[in-house]
Swiss-Prot record:
Keyword Cell inner membrane recorded: no
Catalytic activity entry: tRNA(Val) + L-valine + ATP = L-valyl-tRNA(Val) + AMP + diphosphate
Broad class of the protein's primary localization: cytoplasm
Top EC class, one word: ligase
EC code(s) of this entry: 6.1.1.9
InterPro entries given in the database record: aa-tRNA-synth_I_CS (IPR001412), aa-tRNA-synth_Ia (IPR002300), Anticodon_Ia_Val (IPR033705), M/V/L/I-tRNA-synth_anticd-bd (IPR013155), Rossmann-like_a/b/a_fold (IPR014729), tRNA-bd_arm (IPR010978), tRNAsynth_Ia_anticodon-bd (IPR009080), Val-tRNA_synth_C_sf (IPR037118)
The protein, known as: Valine--tRNA ligase
Amino acid sequence: MEMKPKYNPREVESGRYDQWVNSGYFKAKDDQSKETYTIVIPPPNVTGKLHLGHAWDTTLQDILTRMKRMQGYDTLYLPGMDHAGIATQAKVEAKLNEQGLSRHDLGREKFLEQAWDWKEEYANFIRQQWAKLGLGLDYSRERFTLDEGLSKAVKKVFVDMYNKGLIYRGEYIINWDPIARTALSDIEVIHEDVQGKFYHFKYPYADGNGYIEIATTRPETMLGDTAIVVNPNDERYKDVIGKTVILPIVGRELPILADEYVDIEFGSGAMKVTPAHDPNDFEIGNRHDLERIIVMDESGKMNDKADKYQGMDRFDCREQLVKDLEAENLVIKIEEHEHSVGHSERSGAVVEPYLSTQWFVKMKPLAEQALNNQKTDDRIDFVPARFEKTFNRWMEEIRDWTISRQLWWGHQIPAWYHKETGEIFVGEHEPEDIENWVQDEDVLDTWFSSALWPFSTLGWPDVEADDFQRYFPTNALVTGYDIIFFWVARMIFQGLEFTGKRPFNDVLLHGLVRAEDGRKMSKSLGNGVDPMDVIDEYGADSLRYFLATGSSPGHDLRYSTEKVESIWNFINKIWNAARFSIMNIGEDFTVEQVDLSGDLSLADKWILTRLNETIENVTELSDKYEFGEVGRTLYNFIWDEFCDWYIEMSKIPMNGEDEAQKQITRSVLTYVLDNTMRMLHPFMPFVTEQIWQNLPHEGETIVKAAWPKVNEALVFDDSKETMQQLVEIIKSVRQSRLEVDTPLSKAIPIFIKAKDENIKETLLNNSNYIDRFCHPSELTIDTTIEIPEKAMTSVTTAGEVVLPLEGLIDMDKEIARLENELLKWEKELDRVNKKLANENFVNKAPEKVINEEREKKQTYQEKYDGVKLRINQLKA
């Protein structure tokens, strides 16, 4: 495709992805001569559109895999999706509800058919979104958490853990959704601050002598109270420990027990214990062997243990119960109280802590294994490193994990109950006399199968599988810091338990994508951004570059349309520079003609030197995952140096008569642009492919081109200082012209008083650049120059730049400008003098740093003296 005058992302990106995929560029090659690099995509839920967080995740992963492919690795970027138990089931049920049906009307088998249809529809939609983002995925290895291979892995893990005593069935307090009627994982519970009430009640002593004050936010749970606890160190209650109180309304006697869990400073210092409806109370109940009384059913209605409140909704019961207590003069006070209340992410229901018989994973031994691994050479590196402390803290404080869910969509638990004896059979296959058994109806928590993702996707439990042998462990996991516990930690302990290896070498953690004002993006706030809309407007390359470079590891990213647009402008700049270069290189120029051994100009040497420095910096920063710094490095090199300076300087030989110099310039343009496109390619795959295809090149695609390497033969350190001097001179002339409102089209004399003979010779040898950028009517460069009385002077590192001002300037204005400049150098001198006078700095700082400060002092002093001299001259 040709380079059209205007950059149009839709035209550039159209059809390119299909060409890459159909050509097999993203397929892992199983080339034994190459080192492997593997990333398995964090599987998105098959519930709808990908959000900006997914786009951020996958862009970073794609950058890493594209870069490693170019660096010669056998690269596998494995795609896949998650069945997302409750989320998908809720969507399918909502669709059925629109038809006036429930899942129970269909039955389990028919409902699951509907769920699989949903999965197929949305899986295609997700693939389309991956394509628009340009992700280099190996679709021949795509996996799904409910596919046959992963189901086999899930069954084996469950059975093995059960046989090891790591999975058990028992009673525990879980998060319960009374609308969806299922247990929830902690990540499926959204905590919101709500305005509620704090109720203070009287619990009368059984002996009739007074009462003890109890406070609660959930009065309806008091019907299940089985004790009162106080802190044994609380002087107020030492004499009542062992006594009993009467539970209001119900009349049940409750013992007063001592437990150090109670906070003496909070409320009255006495706490009711409801072991069946609060996780902390459950633990207290275990310590004191208390009865567990469940007072609600699975729908959130009060059950037969709730006496006269049976059949009432829990919140209606709360209201009536408080009225009844008021009637009996047992309410001390009711306070307004803002507190955090958990809501189901899917149904919106207020989550009920609920005692239920569920399947659990015994976490302590698994957590200890993960913690111990972090003390070995096989440890996992967290980026940023501070998140290892977060990981360790969660592992140390871990509780057993509820893994059963009262759903139909998911991995059905491989456990069967004997119809007559109640015996439990757990196995990878059903019992032989299946007619005597019934399978557990529950399914496993989605995170159970997701925890096996890095190795189950590669063929495990077949440890001889080619992909498992070659591509596991994986190299990097890229994900948000908000799921370190829910997913990252679980993959780590399952990887160690079942493969004996860490599942990935590095964990790169990013933050949340926030709205521009810093608020979290959400449907309720209406501030969400669809990444596909951004791509339609600005192109995938603009969005990818913004996501990759807009933040540093571990930090949140604020979405900004203005910043995406500025990157679109950056790509426009690249496009225009490339188009100019390609037009000047010419169609007949081939890659074999690139020759950098000839008589290189200063500009050639400088841009080649800066290119090599940029290659080195970008490679090092990428290896550290510092993509924000990579973005700044590439932006500065491409925009500030290649486009603004070298492209303009290349016009001198290209517009000249010297064919040899033209050929050298073509070589430099080709070499620099080719290497720059390769560096940019992982970030901006579409536009770089388009430009690269129009350059003289070897190979069929930039996807498979080699990553740039530093070429020491093309590093000319002296060129940087000379170019800096020239750029300073050119900028000072342009600034001076601006200040006196003199356009570049008007030729004026320019005098340069060089610091010494060497600088003078260098400037004379490169005066063509000053001519090109400054348009002087005459240019004088010498070490001694008689400066006109009325002149504008700028002090640069090369010397003084003088523009005669006769008829051009207001003298008073120029003196004021110079006095401001003098003040600037005075402040810099004061700062550096204080630093060098600081004994602590001089004694502790490295010698190199001290010398740099001394050099700064000398430079500032020279500039200060030069400006002061000009002020005196003008005033005279």
